[in-house]
Design a protein with these regions (language model features):
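Conserved serine/cysteine hydrolase catalytic core
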Residues: 165-170, 174-243, 261
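Gly/Ala-rich beta-loop-alpha elbow adjacent to hydrolase catalytic centers
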Residues: 80-85, 89
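Conserved HGGG/HGGXW glycine-rich cap/lid loop of the alpha/beta-hydrolase fold
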Residues: 2-48, 66-70, 74-75
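Post-His helix in hydrolase/transferase enzymes
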Residues: 243-259
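Active-site loop/oxyanion-hole signature of alpha/beta-hydrolase fold enzymes
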Residues: 35-37, 41-78, 91-99, 117-126
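Flexible "cap/lid" loop of the alpha/beta hydrolase fold
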Residues: 94-145, 183-187
Length: 262
């Protein structure tokens, strides 16, 4: 990997995962001398909260917001969101634009001032062919929308980890936790992104061409066209879990992005 300026990377996981999913990338980046912070969102990884405790995106995103708030005023980070983590980092961009060097969306949801969370959810659902063994929980009754979900071994193997080492898939089957699902009214509460704040942060999108979860043409390219970032990178032969299937290529990509926008 190219030597040069050292950066502080903040890595945010996607749905049902946790800080644990970054272990390969963290090791590579730290070996290059970079500072890396990895966070568990609420009710994720080893965070002590339970999914039933979460009533809004703000509740789920609290660990990231607290972390960003705790940074010294002069410190700026490279904020990286994977999959659903793109929503988390978007909310942080709106509140802390001055603390972010560049935001990197890794085969991720990328809302914007003219593309709200509900529109993303609808587009995502249109490209889902089967939920397979994903388990949905209906704490408000079967006649209402599900309140959480957790991915099962089959959908993880087929759609998330199909090009990743089998031991990483095994790890995931033991460590995934339910992620909260919110109805449209909650999704639209306190989640507005402005051109003045969110819009002033430079954005890079990393496309994974073999992603079976957020498919390249049906979702990733749709996002890029509807909310154009400053730059787009492609990692070839990467499944949804690029940090497992292509950890070195992905880490090199992050360093290259960070040095360009430093």
């Amino acid at each position: 990997m190219e030597k040069g300026n050292k950066n502080h990377f903040v890595l945010v996981h996607g749905a049902c995962h946790g800080a644990w999913c970054w272990y390969k990338v963290v090791t590579i980046l730290r070996s290059e001398g970079h500072k890396v912070s990895v966070l568990d969102m609420a009710a994720s990884g080893i965070n002590p909260k339970h999914v039933e405790d979460l009533n809004s995106m703000a509740d789920y995103n609290e660990p990231l917001m607290e972390f960003m708030n705790s940074l010294p005023q002069q410190e700026r980070v490279v904020l990286v969101g994977h999959s659903m983590g793109g929503i988390n980092i978007s909310l942080a961009m709106e509140k802390f634009p001055h603390k972010i060097v560049v935001a990197v969306f890794v085969t991720a949801f990328m809302p914007g001032p003219d593309l709200n969370f509900v529109a993303l959810s609808q587009q995502y659902n249109q490209q889902v062919e089967s939920h397979m063994d994903t388990e949905f929980v209906y704490n408000n009754g079967l006649e209402k929308c599900p309140t959480s979900l957790v991915f099962g071994p089959k959908v993880l193997a087929t759609n998330f980890y199909q090009l990743s080492p089998p031991e990483d898939l095994t790890l995931a089957t033991y460590l995934v936790r339910p992620v909260p699902l919110f109805d449209e009214s909650i999704l639209l509460t306190n989640t507005t992104l402005s051109k003045e704040k969110y819009g002033c942060v430079r954005r890079v999108y990393v496309v994974c061409d073999k992603d079976n979860v957020l498919k390249e043409e049906q979702f990733q390219r749709w996002l890029i066209n509807n909310n154009p970032p400053n730059e787009v990178h492609m990692i070839h032969d990467a499944d949804h879990m690029v940090m497992f299937s292509k950890p070195r290529e992905f880490s090199s990509c992050l360093v290259m992005i960070s040095q360009k926008y430093h």
